[in-house]
């Protein structure tokens, strides 16, 4: 008598191991991009896993029962996903109500969008790019869950139809899924534009209008449900064609070696992808550019590599996959991967406050342990009790106690009353605060807005006709530098060119005698345009101060072009950059520090080293200046050029 074969994949420890690989990659990437620049691709692995598992469940149910119960499927998904997410949203709202009240107004739309499974489209619509580094965005990571939740809503409907009208033609449906994934890859490649997708300091290239708002092309491609569904379709195709648990048990032999090879090929493909697709976008002096290969088949390639890893993980003869991915550590992480994904990003954000700030190894270990503790609490006391129906049992027992007239002890009544009070008061406070909060700028944005206004006023005052007065000699590095007058307008004796860092000290620099030209998101190349113009109208004076490189990675050629224009300027002072963005900081500072050896009139002020010693002068993004830091920064520059 033959043994009945299971109709559905049972528990697969190695598949949990695949989840673990994906979530660890994402967590490391979110902690510090320089550690694993392609770690964001872990999300694509999750998409393939979801497409595979959900389609497998739906096909198995159809074969077992002759139909698919849409209601039961959606209830199971809701019990699996919603409780932990609701706890997260409530927890973030309560934390911000107590400690980050200025951010509540900005958070309100994010929470509403997350509740209705539309966070990715909300993020596209409001134009808060996924790639901004200086925003407080504790829920930004929910975009990928929104993509999956939309899939969970629509996919059962499609599978219900497919299993009804084409039950005997599932292979054809599987081929259709593959063709659809290829079509998505082609559409993404055709929609993507190579080169600069946004000029530094300007609005990203608009792709289309969505409900009256401009949509940036790169946000649409990276965050959109349609363009990111390719992995889901590949996973669904795998579920149609690959159900090894239906096969008769066979010896490992050569078949095991074959699937070990498939596993290694897939794992190698993911490793190569993480190395090649180093980020989604990069900002250089040309502008913000995307990684062409990523949008021209890169996501599809990652999906194929994920298919290979998953196919091996669920096959009983793939011993290598089971050993590497099915051990206790990997399965522990994999079973909690949903909670880890949910909680790690808010923990990181509530600590560092700004998305682009990299964590140190010490901070990373502590914050991951905190996220893991929250995940474990959620797993034990929220996710599993809801999934197993324990909350319903508890509630029925409480009702039975009341119906039977059971007398509780005073201590028990007090304990329950205290828990009830906390469970009601804090959430109510958070919800009321959230509903009534105003949308505000964060501290950095507010400071920069005030500085921009000050710069406009200062430039208007400086551009007014005045009598040209020759300055007194000043001593710099042992030499004498004397400013001279021009016939074409007022000489700019000390010209300071910078980005948002210098913008934070614009008023202080002006009060100390400098003419300031600073703006947010400025690239190093834009300094060339400024000095070329001022030289053409003969307004360049004795000293030019340049502090750029926070927003873009520059090149030696750009600095050389600037110095060709400034070769006759007696003193050019460059400041190194201090920004939590690697390798940009290292590359730019290496180029800046090399300038004095090439140009005798160049001096370097090592702002990176100084700022590292005085973190109290910087906002929590470790880049922009607090008011006291603005004064300190201006004094440093004046000391460096001999004016203080």
Annotate each PLM feature:
Residues 1-11, 476-485:
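A short, compositionally biased domain-edge/stem linker segment
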Residues 3-5, 10-15, 21-438:
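Hydrophobic membrane-embedded alpha-helices
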Residues 43, 497-498, 546, 605:
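Active-site flanking residues adjacent to catalytic metal/cofactor-binding acidic residues
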Residues 48, 497-498, 547, 575:
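Short hydrophobic segments within beta-strands
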Residues 192-195, 206-208, 237, 276-280, ...:
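Extracellular/periplasmic envelope-modification machinery, especially enzymes
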Residues 517, 544-549, 573-577:
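Conserved beta-strand segments of the P-loop GTPase G domain that flank and frequently precede/overlap
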Residues 537-539, 563-569:
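Short, conserved loop/helix-junction motifs that constitute active-site signature segments
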């Amino acid at each position: 008598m033959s043994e009945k074969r299971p109709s559905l994949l049972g528990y697969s420890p190695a598949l949990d191991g695949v989840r673990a690989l994906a979530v660890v990659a994402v967590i490391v990437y979110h902690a510090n991009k320089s550690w694993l620049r392609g770690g964001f691709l872990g999300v694509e692995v999750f998409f393939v896993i979801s497409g595979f598992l959900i389609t497998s469940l739906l096909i198995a149910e159809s074969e077992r029962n002759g139909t698919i119960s849409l209601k039961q499927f959606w209830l199971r998904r809701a019990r699996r996903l919603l409780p932990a997410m609701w706890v997260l949203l409530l927890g973030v709202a309560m934390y911000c109500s107590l400690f980050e009240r200025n951010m509540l107004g900005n958070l309100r739309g994010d929470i509403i969008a997350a509740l209705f499974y539309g966070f990715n489209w909300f993020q596209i619509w409001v134009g808060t790019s996924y790639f901004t580094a200086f925003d407080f965005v504790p829920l930004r990571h929910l975009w990928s869950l929104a993509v999956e939740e939309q899939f969970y809503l629509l996919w059962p409907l499609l599978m219900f139809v497919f299993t009804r009208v084409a039950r005997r033609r599932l292979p054809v449906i599987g081929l259709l899924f593959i063709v659809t994934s290829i079509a998505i890859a082609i559409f993404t490649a055709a929609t993507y534009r190579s080169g600069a997708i946004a000029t530094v300091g300007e609005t990203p290239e608009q792709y289309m209008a969505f409900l009256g708002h401009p949509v940036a092309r790169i946000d649409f491609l990276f965050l959109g449900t349609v363009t990111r569904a390719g992995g889901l379709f590949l996973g669904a195709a795998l579920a149609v064609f690959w159900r090894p648990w239906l096969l008769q048990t066979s010896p490992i032999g050569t078949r095991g070696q074959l699937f070990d090879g498939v596993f290694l090929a897939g794992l190698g493909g993911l490793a190569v992808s993480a190395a090649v697709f180093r980020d989604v976008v990069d900002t250089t002096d040309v502008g913000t550019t995307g990684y062409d290969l990523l949008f021209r088949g890169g996501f599809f390639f990652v999906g194929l590599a994920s298919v290979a890893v998953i196919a091996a993980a669920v096959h009983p003869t793939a011993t290598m996959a089971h050993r590497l991915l099915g051990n206790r550590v990997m399965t522990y992480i994999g079973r909690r991967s949903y909670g880890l994904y949910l909680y790690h990003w808010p923990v990181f954000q509530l600590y560092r406050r700004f998305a682009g700030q990299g964590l140190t190894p010490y901070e990373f270990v502590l914050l991951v342990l905190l996220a893991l503790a929250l995940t474990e609490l959620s797993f034990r006391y929220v996710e599993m009790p809801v999934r197993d129906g324990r909350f319903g049992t508890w509630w029925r027992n409480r009702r039975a106690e009341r119906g039977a007239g059971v007398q509780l002890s005073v201590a028990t009544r007090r304990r329950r009353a205290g828990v009830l009070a906390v469970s009601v008061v804090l959430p109510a406070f958070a919800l009321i605060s959230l509903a009534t909060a105003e949308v505000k700028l964060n501290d950095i944005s507010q400071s920069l807005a005030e500085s921009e206004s000050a710069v406009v006023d200062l430039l208007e005052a400086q551009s007014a006709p005045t009598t040209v007065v020759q300055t007194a000699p000043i001593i710099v590095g042992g030499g004498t530098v004397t400013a001279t007058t021009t016939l074409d307008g007022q000489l700019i004796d000390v010209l300071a060119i910078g980005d948002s860092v210098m913008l934070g000290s614009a008023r202080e620099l002006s009060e100390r005698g400098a003419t300031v030209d600073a703006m947010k998101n400025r690239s190093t190349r834009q300094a060339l345009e400024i000095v070329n113009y001022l030289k053409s109208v003969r307004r360049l004076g004795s000293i030019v101060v340049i502090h750029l490189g926070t927003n873009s990675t520059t090149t030696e050629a750009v600095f050389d072009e600037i110095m060709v224009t400034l070769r006759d300027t007696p003193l050019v002072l460059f400041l190194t950059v201090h920004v939590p963005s690697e390798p940009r900081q290292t590359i730019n500072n290496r180029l800046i520090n090399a300038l004095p050896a090439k140009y005798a009139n160049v001096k370097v002020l090592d702002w990176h080293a100084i700022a590292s010693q005085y973190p109290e002068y910087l906002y929590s993004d470790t880049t922009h200046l607090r008011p006291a830091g603005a004064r300190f920064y201006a004094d440093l520059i004046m000391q460096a050029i001999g004016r203080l």
